Amino acid sequence: MAMNALNPRIRVIWVVRSLIGALILGGAAGGIAVYRSASLTIPASLTVLFVALGVGHAILRYRSWQYVVGDDALYLERGVLTQVRTEVPLVRIQHVDSRRSAVERLVGLASTVVYTAGSRGADVTIPGLTPDDASDLRQRLKGLAIDAG
């Protein structure tokens, strides 16, 4: 089975989130430096480091994310530092949603959320899909779950 990759635009979302986090941490470090009348060299260096780590993580995260719908289950592989392989048996799927946050809409993406029997929340979210791909995946999983059940 060939695994499916996410849409490359998901990297934009992940990089922007990393940049926001880096700017918040760098701004806090800069604020402390200004308050203590210290040099801004360390906060600036930390901000650059956080940006580089965030961008690197987003790229590696994109490369590690894959999924495929098999005959009996949905298979996912993801993770940068900790690699996670998930298998969701089709007979356990209760319902499937397509979701588009405001940020996803800005870059033309959507997510598919798979809920399984006996869970309190969303068991699996597949981000970085085009709206059409998310809808197609939702319909396909729904049909396969009905057939499996």
Which functions belong to the PLM regions below?
Residues M1-G149:
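N-terminal basic, Ser/Thr-rich segments that initiate or prime the first beta/alpha elements at protein or domain
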